Design a protein with these regions (language model features):
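Basic phosphate/pyrophosphate-binding loop/patch that engages nucleotide-derived ligands
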Residues: 1
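Catalytic loop of the DD-peptidase/beta-lactamase superfamily, centered on the K-T-G motif
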Residues: 4-11, 17, 24-151
Length: 151
């Protein structure tokens, strides 16, 4: 692949033995969702190594495709905008601008945050569903990590 993300796929059967079991709100294992035609909206199976490669690719300002994804297409408010799949925090500030995308499926949650200007990134991959009582810890961890990379 263009970014050498050899551990990422839509085909569960290719990585089934490597998957961490997803957990519901009671902490019980749940089956993976089969999203079929909606696969690109939540069916990517990946790992921290490949997500790191994806973050590093964001730092290449010559990559027109990735740069296009980060262009603001709509404004939510003064401190938040939207790109193609990215929430853009502080879109008017080159110094504090960050790009964020999170996801949830049955038994899993994830967050990726990219600071292109300072070449920093955060990846959080969890087998905790958004309805799990521990899910809020993921948001707290993300907020704490953002604060640390900004300082």
């Amino acid at each position: 692949s263009k970014y050498d993300m050899t551990n990422s796929t839509f085909k569960k059967e290719e990585v089934n033995d490597l998957l961490v079991k997803g957990l519901n709100s009671q902490g019980d294992e749940v089956p993976n969702w089969d999203l079929q035609i909606f696969g690109p909206a939540g069916g990517v199976l990946s790992n921290a190594e490949d997500m790191t490669k994806f973050i590093i690719a964001q730092f290449n300002e010559k990559d027109k495709e990735l740069k296009l994804l980060r262009e603001q297409t709509s404004k939510i408010n003064g401190k938040l905008g939207m790109g193609l799949g990215w929430f853009i925090e502080n879109p008017k500030s080159n110094k504090k601008r960050m790009f964020r995308h999170g996801g949830n499926t049955g038994g899993y949650s994830s967050m990726i945050i990219v600071d292109v200007k300072n070449k920093n990134g955060i990846i959080i991959l969890s087998n905790v569903t958004s309805r799990n009582p521990y899910f809020e810890n993921i948001n707290k961890l993300a907020a704490s990590l953002i604060k640390n990379i900004r300082n």
